């Protein structure tokens, strides 16, 4: 089970949004590279990065910040935001990104996901961000008419490494992860699922480690780490103890 600390990039800075709204962004660190180093020093083993500007623009917009982070941390980094074609997938993987996350294109162009997953086994994840049960696209600005499960099922045999499932209604609000919806998705598919959106406290980490969540790969922590509601040492100690058990 992995706890992924999140770095969301907007204008080269490390921010957190509320419910995916770019107008409701809080800057937590002007230097994302320093933030990445801090997470590494705290003992995290896998970093989750999102290029928010890229998600809206449909192409990478914070490449310089991402590349700077890759130079200072040795842990694997997964990256989403603005990855809409195979050339971008290939470019990021060649620069040292461990795993790319395809979101909007997974809805609009499922063939891209299948092609990328086939070309780069184990290095392509799908990001499914749901609002009222339906998947949102274009940096969450638009809602589709399909559910997360419907899209996830399209990729069952495609070699997708993970599904990152976000409940937009909870994202950035510290209301706790929507475990019921996340676990229901994980139980309905064979692809590992990563929980995202609203992780609020150590209670969410305990929920992630509970027997009913055994099909998950882990969860993403954002605002709770930045504002001190989640103690990294306590969270990582719990995960370590669960691993050793």
Curated annotation (Swiss-Prot):
One of its GO terms (cellular component) is cytoplasm. Disulfide bonds: none annotated. Signal peptide: none annotated. The keyword Isomerase applies. Keywords: Amino-acid biosynthesis, Cytoplasm, Histidine biosynthesis, Isomerase. Gene3D superfamilies: Aldolase class I. It catalyses: 1-(5-phospho-beta-D-ribosyl)-5-[(5-phospho-beta-D-ribosylamino)methylideneamino]imidazole-4-carboxamide = 5-[(5-phospho-1-deoxy-D-ribulos-1-ylimino)methylamino]-1-(5-phospho-beta-D-ribosyl)imidazole-4-carboxamide. GO terms for biological process: L-histidine biosynthetic process; L-tryptophan biosynthetic process. Belongs to the HisA/HisF family. This is 1-(5-phosphoribosyl)-5-[(5-phosphoribosylamino)methylideneamino] imidazole-4-carboxamide isomerase. It comes from Rhodopseudomonas palustris (strain HaA2).
